[in-house]
Amino acid sequence: MTENVQLGALLAACHWIGEKGWCPATGGNMSLRLDSAQCLVTESGKDKGSLTADDFLLVETANNHVPSGRTPSAETGLHTLLYRLYPEINAVLHTHSVNATVLSRVERSNELVLHGYEMQKSLSGQRSHLDSVVIPIFDNDQDIPALAQRVAALADNHPLRYGFLVRGHGLYCWGNSVSEARRHLEGLEFLFQCELQRRLLDANFKLGAK
């Protein structure tokens, strides 16, 4: 019953994401942990705004094996990595929004630091705009196992919280439930839009001051 409730919540989140335009042209992928050994991952090439329960494939978390023989998302290995790293993660959302994609390219360092925004409190455990939220940025790579190794290497020394960006690609975020993952996604997207607008205004102000 719990699995059905969570899958229903994930389907609703996917349809909402589709309406937001955060996964255009069948991009993005979503997943749900079932237990310590298995998860459900979206099938490759499916429009996220019109997914059904049949579009989620059973995947073995340890080795990415799909018993059905169907093809899951090409980035399944990043989902299963997160489930192996953090037992508390129960849902992962990967989106391709304009704000996340552009901001990940504008920011030249390997992390995006968000500071001074009240909406930082949309992220679990954040209590004040005076704190900083650090979102790692990884260079994009079509070799997903190699990208997963880089994510795992960072996580060994700096535990990942809320999400990470893949440069020029998009956002991965998660939560201990579908509802928390969805809240983190909405909060981060708002923060990304604020940060992008702030940088644009700063650039225009500096240009006008010359």
UniProtKB/Swiss-Prot annotation:
Catalytic activity: 5-(methylsulfanyl)-D-ribulose 1-phosphate = 5-methylsulfanyl-2,3-dioxopentyl phosphate + H2O
EC number: 4.2.1.109
SUPFAM superfamilies: AraD/HMP-PK domain-like (SSF53639)
Required cofactor names: Zn(2+)
Family annotation (Gene3D superfamilies): Class II aldolase/adducin N-terminal domain (3.40.225.10)
Co-factor remark: Binds 1 zinc ion per subunit.
Biological-process GO terms, alphabetical: L-methionine salvage from methylthioadenosine; monosaccharide metabolic process
Presence of keyword Magnesium: no
One Pfam family matching this protein: Aldolase_II
One of the record's GO molecular function terms: zinc ion binding
Keyword Amino-acid biosynthesis: yes
Broad enzyme group: lyase
Annotated coiled-coil segments of the chain: none
Binding positions for Zn(2+) per the UniProt entry: H94, H96
Swiss-Prot/TrEMBL keywords: Amino-acid biosynthesis, Lyase, Metal-binding, Methionine biosynthesis, Zinc
Pathway the protein contributes to: Amino-acid biosynthesis; L-methionine biosynthesis via salvage pathway; L-methionine from S-methyl-5-thio-alpha-D-ribose 1-phosphate: step 2/6
GO cellular component: cytoplasm
Top-level taxon: Bacteria
Similarity comment: Belongs to the aldolase class II family. MtnB subfamily.
HAMAP family attached to this UniProt entry: Salvage_MtnB
Role summary: Catalyzes the dehydration of methylthioribulose-1-phosphate (MTRu-1-P) into 2,3-diketo-5-methylthiopentyl-1-phosphate (DK-MTP-1-P).
Protein name: Methylthioribulose-1-phosphate dehydratase
Source lineage: Bacteria, Pseudomonadati, Pseudomonadota, Gammaproteobacteria, Enterobacterales
Record gene name: mtnB
